[in-house]
Amino acid sequence: LMALRILRDEVLHSARTPFRYNTGRVLIQIMKEIIRSRQDELTQLKLVHDFRKVTSGNPRLVRQFLNTYHLLEMPEEWNQLTVDHHVHDANTKGRKNATHLIMDAWIKGIRYITVVYYNYVEPAAARELLQAAEIMGVDVRIGLEFRTPFRDRFVCFVWAPRGFSDPEAFLSFLAERPMVALMNEGRKASLWMQRHVMDTLQLWNAKHAPALAEELEIPVPLLEPEAFLAYVGTGQTSFLHLAEYAHKTLLKHLVQRVKALQEEALTATSERQSQIAQLIRRMDMLTTEVIMETWLKPERNPELPSPDVPDNAPDTPELLRMPPHVLLDWLSCLRSGYRITLQLAELTAEDVLELLWDCQGMITHLELFNLKEWQEGHLRHLTAINDLQIAINKGSVLHLKQILRGMIRTLEASSSEKDKERCAKFRIILRNIPSLQAPYKVAPLRIRIGTDSTSHSGVRHGMGLAMPETLPHGARRQI
């Protein structure tokens, strides 16, 4: 943290230029590149030369380097509307520690950020994050993501307590007895998920690794549980970590096998060359994402209990058995100031309406856009959900009745017993629309947008979303 403070002061005040914020962003980015190139002295020398040129603060030169590093120019008044209300650091499934995450957010020009932790947050992690954000002038919130059973699956909420004057006030809140009790329950939920991941690791060793070794004609090392947990480190064990670790252990053998095949292809028959080319393509495609989708996702392993399906077994933590309204009532009692955001992945407008009704105004925000979920095709009902949100906020009884009657007609046409039960519930809501609207007359149902970035995958966009109208003309033209 001290190094971060010194770094910010140096880059903002070393250049005698009115273009100091953008100059500082480029200087830190070049420093990162110098560190990454520590094994390549020639590249480092070139980067040091670039660094010296940028310290002049020449706007034309700085803009060139912004473009080189895929950074948008930000206004020197530093009043841009740039946000990301859903990112992860290394204490969950992200790659960067809290200090690194905040530094990168500043480089990207992000002013408002919410870092999401699963089930609990360690005080040391919260302290580092909040102090780093204070140093860099980034407005940060800490959100805790909880999963709760709803109609044979889990829905996710992000609870972000607010109203703290400084980092110490938030840390004092974490030390209060009710919060300690919640964090302890959260740790149980995370350990429950870890057991599911470790069971999948054992299945990989017993089933998937031998099959993959036979297919690719390479040795596929078995994964050691202790080594895997050491690889996860301070993070919370996840299927993403498992996929990355499996890929890491495979990579050396893949590279060696590809080299051997390329040498063999030089003297092979045309038929064998075709087989070799196909095998190399298969190896090239074996990314972390492919390993996850093909072998590690719960639906790919039906012989194991799925952590994505609610279970009332005695060993299931209480936190994962609470209905949504019970969990949210608990959270809302812990702090008078809070935001509770409903995540919309795989939810329909009917699901959202029912949750809003059940939770009686405790849901304050909808995560209307999540870049990761959108890329994966999990946000198919955003238009209908947005229409519902607008109708609730406008206070239009006629509009809400129209939406509800359309839902009821669809449910009436279904032969499912669950749809009939939901239809009866929606008729009750139809007769009590003012009760649905009442909590949102004072504080409208708002939205949150985020990327769900973990800084891991090269096939996904990084963190940060910007309102183009708040950016300089050159950046808008570039977009």
PLM region spans:
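Charged catalytic cores and adjacent phosphate/nucleic-acid-binding surfaces used
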Residues: 1-112, 121-182, 188, 261-265, ...
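Non-catalytic, alpha-helical, charged scaffold/linker segments
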Residues: 169-283
